Amino acid sequence: MHRTFLFSKIHHCTLTETNLEYVGSISIDQTLLDAAGIVPYEQVQVVNMNNGERLVTYAIPAPADSGAVELNGAAARLGTRGDRVIIMTYAQLTSEEIEGFEPRVVLVDQENRVIEDAPVVNASTPELCLT
């Protein structure tokens, strides 16, 4: 039996742009994709912290170190520049894979740069809440 678990998360990104006329997806700075282990065209869930909207789309790379996080296509209607979002991927794990598994959590600053010295957030630190 497989169970679905959070695989990776980019926490508190800031939307830098929306592009209604683009075919679809969310463009994400390649540096953030690499840090989170997200590959191009992988399914992602995006949660908008400003308006509560949730959507499922796929990730495409934006230039590395650009800080770009852009909602494209119809998804552009669900956010505006400056909104804070959480980007998540999930994985199907077997019972054997579950033990010891921890998702990859990437914390970013307001310019969507990885916070290198951020504390590790996992099940053993539920009291940690970043603003």
From Swiss-Prot:
Q: What class of enzyme is it?
A: lyase
Sorted alphabetically, the keyword list is: Autocatalytic cleavage, Cytoplasm, Decarboxylase, Lyase, Pantothenate biosynthesis, Pyruvate, Schiff base, Zymogen
Principal location class:
cytoplasm
What is this enzyme's catalytic activity, as reactions? Answer: L-aspartate + H(+) = beta-alanine + CO2
Keyword Cytoplasm: yes or no?
yes
Superkingdom of origin: Bacteria
Name the Gene Ontology molecular function terms of this record: aspartate 1-decarboxylase activity
Query: Which Pfam families would you find in this protein's record?
Result: Asp_decarbox
> What's the EC number here?
4.1.1.11
Task: Give the Pyruvic acid (Ser) positions (modified residues).
Answer: S25
Q: Where is the active site?
A: S25 (schiff-base intermediate with substrate), Y58 (proton donor)
Q: Which cofactor does it need?
A: pyruvate
Q: Name one GO cellular component term.
A: cytosol
Which cellular compartments is it found in?
Cytoplasm
The free-text note explaining how the cofactor binds reads: Binds 1 pyruvoyl group covalently per subunit.
Positions that bind substrate: T57, G73, A74, A75
UniProt record similarity statement: Belongs to the PanD family.
- What role does this protein play? Catalyzes the pyruvoyl-dependent decarboxylation of aspartate to produce beta-alanine.
PANTHER family assigned to the protein according to its UniProt record, in alphabetical order? ASPARTATE 1-DECARBOXYLASE
Q: Which NCBIfam families match?
A: panD
UniProt protein name: Aspartate 1-decarboxylase
The species this protein belongs to is Acaryochloris marina (strain MBIC 11017)
Q: Gene name?
A: panD
